[in-house]
């Protein structure tokens, strides 16, 4: 007789919880310099000087990870024992060779549940995928280990992944570090909370509609969505596997831009295309990074996407930051939003092209109930024919071409082309669970396959953002819903993220420009 889905859930959680109850010396104070190290560079200096060991670094972060999980329910698969063993191997390597193994030597890393890690499940929040451990590491994990990184744990995500919050029947609800009644975002929400609470130094998530950038925005982090093909997706489990027209991408999340940049550069310089034939052999372009690290920028600005107006704190932070950019000598250009709605519509049609069959099959394998957002997704429409899919792809290509033409035609008052865009990450800050409905500000750039970095630009402040919202007349149902969520009394102090956006394969440009932007924060 098949086991009930509730029995499987109970067993999976019991295995995780048993690993979390094991003592790793939490009663012994760790070196305060470890957690105080703000980024990889600072940690590397401590390790190189032998002020701390990799083992001590991992132990300190295990303690923080356990605290973060107790507070937010962010972890799924635990590999603390393996992490400590790896850390001791790194210490032995340094003792023998007198140097660190690689640019990520001893860096505690966490992974969204999707990434295959040998011996552990990649469930995607599906009960039916429990107790089917990966036979080998995915390419990204193999390379991370070669670079010296230490994998601590895997983190929670929503059922079927495709949502901006983090909840599923298998692992349960992940909550915001500041308020258990609020969502940390998603779908890389477990990463967002773990990083925000110092349980990891570098996280890796995935993004098909904002899944790296939304939790980064809500948790005060930096989150980088590259174009498809810069980082390996080989052996990373995903819903709707085979749907490649709107590709999910892998990207880093961290508390600092320097960590994002170092991790991105190290991963690209590792030449993962030798292990993953889907990647183009595109090396790190130092000259491009250096150029945009220094040159005055021309920035297209879009505070309103034309569909859903952002809340007052988002608008205030955006406009204040624009003033800083102009004062620093950068040129700002208003951005045309006329193609945005078409981009979102085409993207949504790709999500449901199979009529929900892929998700239904995974759900049938476990027998658990559908989360409301998943039920809504699979009920949205019937599968389309191959010919209809071809026509949809043609519309996508035509719209991408039109957007590119628009970008090329947009110039500053001095006649210079636009380098990057500045855009809100979301129309609101963190909000109550199960109320997120509109990630259009992030989805736009998945449809275009652009490079986009979300960064913490400010916070909602009751003293500055207590404005009357009743005077605004919403444009549509999504806009009305968004405005119904605004409550500055409850949103006071929550992070506000903005995005720097470049075109396809412009990762070095975006990161270089971001370092200029960071100086103004």
UniProtKB/Swiss-Prot annotation:
Disruption phenotype: Does not affect 2-benzoxazolinone (BOA) degradation.
Keyword field: Hydrolase
Induction: Expression is induced in response to 2-benzoxasolinone (BOA) exposure.
Domain of life: Eukaryota
Annotated Gene3D superfamilies: Amidase signature (AS) domain (3.90.1300.10)
GO molecular function: hydrolase activity
Reactions this protein catalyses: a monocarboxylic acid amide + H2O = a monocarboxylate + NH4(+)
Pathway annotation: Xenobiotic degradation
EC class (word): hydrolase
Residues bound to substrate: 187, 208-211
PROSITE patterns registered for this protein in UniProt: AMIDASES
Protein's name in the database: Amidase 1
The organism's taxonomic lineage, starting at the top: Eukaryota, Fungi, Dikarya, Ascomycota, Pezizomycotina
Gene name, Swiss-Prot/TrEMBL: AMD1
């Amino acid at each position: 007789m098949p086991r009930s889905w509730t029995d499987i859930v109970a067993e999976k959680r019991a295995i995780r919880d048993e690993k979390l109850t094991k003592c790793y010396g939490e009663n012994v104070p760790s070196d305060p310099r470890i957690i105080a190290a703000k980024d990889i560079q600072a940690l590397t200096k401590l390790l190189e000087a032998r002020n701390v060991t990799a083992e001590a670094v991992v132990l300190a972060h295990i303690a923080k990870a356990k605290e973060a999980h107790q507070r937010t329910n962010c972890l799924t698969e635990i590999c603390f024992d393996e992490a400590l063993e790896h850390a001791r191997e790194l210490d032995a390597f340094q003792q023998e060779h007198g140097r660190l193994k690689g640019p990520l030597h001893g860096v505690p890393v966490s992974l969204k549940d999707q990434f295959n890690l040998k011996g552990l499940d990649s469930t995607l929040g599906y009960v039916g995928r429990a107790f089917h451990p990966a036979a080998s590491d995915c390419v990204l994990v193999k390379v991370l280990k070669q670079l010296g990184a230490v994998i601590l744990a895997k983190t929670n995500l929503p059922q079927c992944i495709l949502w901006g919050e983090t909840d599923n029947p298998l692992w349960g609800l992940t909550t915001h570090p500041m308020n258990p009644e609020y969502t940390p975002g998603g779908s890389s929400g477990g990463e967002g909370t773990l990083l925000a609470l110092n349980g990891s130094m570098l996280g890796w998530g995935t993004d098909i509609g904002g899944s790296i950038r939304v939790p980064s925005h809500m948790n005060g982090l930096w989150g980088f969505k590259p174009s498809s093909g810069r980082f390996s997706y080989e052996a990373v489990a995903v819903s709707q596997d085979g749907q490649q027209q709107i590709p999910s991408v892998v990207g880093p999340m961290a508390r600092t831009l320097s960590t994002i940049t170092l991790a991105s550069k190290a991963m690209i310089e590792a030449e993962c295309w030798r292990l993953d034939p889907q990647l183009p052999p595109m090396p790190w372009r130092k000259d491009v990074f250096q150029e945009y690290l220094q040159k005055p920028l021309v920035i297209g600005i879009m505070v309103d996407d034309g569909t859903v107006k952002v809340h007052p704190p988002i608008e205030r932070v955006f406009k204040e930051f624009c003033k800083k950019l102009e004062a620093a000598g950068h040129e700002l250009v208003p951005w045309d939003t006329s193609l945005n709605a078409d981009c979102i519509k085409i993207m949504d049609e790709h999500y449901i092209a199979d009529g929900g069959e892929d998700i239904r099959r995974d759900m049938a394998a476990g027998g658990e109930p559908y989360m409301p957002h998943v039920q809504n997704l699979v009920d949205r429409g019937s599968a389309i024919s191959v010919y209809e899919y071809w026509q949809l792809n043609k519309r996508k290509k035509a719209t991408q071409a039109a957007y590119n033409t628009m970008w090329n035609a947009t110039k500053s008052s001095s006649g210079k082309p636009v380098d990057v865009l500045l855009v809100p990450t979301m129309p609101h800050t963190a909000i109550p669970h199960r109320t997120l409905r509109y990630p259009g500000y992030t989805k736009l750039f998945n449809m275009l396959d652009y490079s986009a970095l979300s960064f913490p630009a400010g916070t909602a402040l009751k003293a500055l953002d207590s404005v009357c919202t009743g005077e605004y007349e919403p444009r549509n149902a999504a806009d009305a819903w968004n405005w119904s969520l605004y409550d500055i009394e409850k949103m006071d102090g929550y992070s506000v993220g903005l995005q720097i956006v470049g075109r396809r394969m412009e990762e070095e440009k975006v990161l270089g420009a971001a370092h200029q932007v960071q100086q103004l924060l």
